[in-house]
Amino acid sequence: NPMKKEKGLHSRNIHLQEYNFDALIKDYPSLASFVKKNKYDALGIDFFNPNAVLTLNQALLAHNYKVIDWSVPKGHLCPPVPGRADYIHYIADLLAEAHDGKPPVGTKIKGLDIGSGTSCIYPILGNCIYGWKFVGSDISSDAINHANKILNSNPTLKKNIKTRFQKSAKHTFKDLIKSDEKFDFTMCNPPFYSSLEEAKNASSRKVKNLNVNKVKKGHTPVNKNNP
């Protein structure tokens, strides 16, 4: 069945199409138990189920980027891969301005992610999509340790991404960047929600508002399996 494009994503984002669940399940079989047909006869997952959301994003990373053993600790928010990939593509657009209008690729480009978190998602996607090197910093040693477990399972990522513990929460760059070190860009994208509960409430409001607008326009309401 034809897959329509998602609105709002960058033109280079490979997640422009709706999820191909058959392909995702083939590469990540554990996703199968979360995929159901909704009342509109479309495949989807329950986006209010944290385990389903995590497994979907694990499948996206495995299928599209060949990343294995990626996870976030229980109780932590799961970053949506398509949106995080978008962020990387827009950084590439900014870098392109200094590279003859073309997004630069390869390890000659080095980025610094302030607050890379447990998932290390931006360095991972930046390396997978454009081949950039990264340093990811965090003020949480638990976050650094978890990120390192992911990197250790993926040799290419481990080679190109390094994590650093920032001892002082008051400082961003101090005692983090080495004296002879240069970065092409730095980035910082703090979490949008402080807890899973806050994220769930925001998601519920989003679906409710979408349904109100769709009904007003005479369209089919949104089901929570496909918001």
Feature annotation, model-predicted:
Residues I139-C188:
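S-adenosyl-L-methionine
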Residues A59-N64, P82-K110:
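Conserved alpha-helix/loop element of class I SAM-dependent methyltransferases that forms part
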Residues H76, K110-S116, T163-F165, T186-M187:
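Extended hydrophobic secondary-structure segments that form protein cores and membrane-embedded regions
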Residues T118-W132:
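Conserved SAM-binding loop of SAM-dependent methyltransferases across substrates and taxa
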Residues K133-I139:
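Conserved SAM-binding motif I beta-strand of class I
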